[in-house]
Amino acid sequence: MEMSRLKPSGRIGDNMKKILGLIGLYALIVLFCFYFFIQHPKNIFDEIYQETAKNYLGYYNFNELKNVTVKNRKLYDSNMNETDKYESIITYDDSSLGSDAKNLELRFNFDGSSKGINIWFERYTNSGEKINFVIHYGFKKKVLVKKIMIYENSSKTYIEDEAQVKSYLEKYGITAKDLDSYYDEIVNQKVLKDWCSIFDSKYSPSNYGEVKVETQWENW
């Protein structure tokens, strides 16, 4: 006598659908959380970069500051052909920086491997020479690099060689602590304070968040 084959009941099939549905929903939640974690700003420079990248072609945060000029510059390729890419440039009025600093500028690169923020400013010493601060935040690696070079008035040239820069600073009695204070008064007390005044930041000038900081003069 041939035995009849057992068929799954409708209830078991419905339960299986519910289980598969819950698994699918859970997977979507995990993917969403992972995406949010990856995209979520890890530090104050991330925050500035991402907000600017989202809004720079319209009205965005830096437009709210009174003493800055905001512009977007169209980029060209190596053959000088126009592209659809831009860099955003924020220039501070010298009058907002005090008597010893000039030419503070932020540039945002939104394309390729060099995505990030470049910050430049000049700090004048008592001798009349100027120290150029060159600061770069790399968006992909989450690294902030702080460097300097010297513009020598007598020769009208920039000194970039580290040994020559150190020798120059020693000649005029400028210490690593002085360089830290010059950086602090412009980047922390000006740029980042301004940012926190126009954006509800999770970070602050004294709490950058998760970022690796490489300072050229750290052990000078």
Name every feature range the model reports, one short phrase each:
Residues 2, 14-19:
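Positively charged n-region of N-terminal signal peptides that target proteins for export
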Residues 31-125:
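N-terminal export/targeting and maturation segments
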Residues 87-220:
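Extracytoplasmic electrostatic interaction patches
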Residues 19-37:
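Hydrophobic membrane-insertion alpha-helices, especially the h-region
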Residues 13-14, 108:
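Intrinsic-disorder/low-complexity regions
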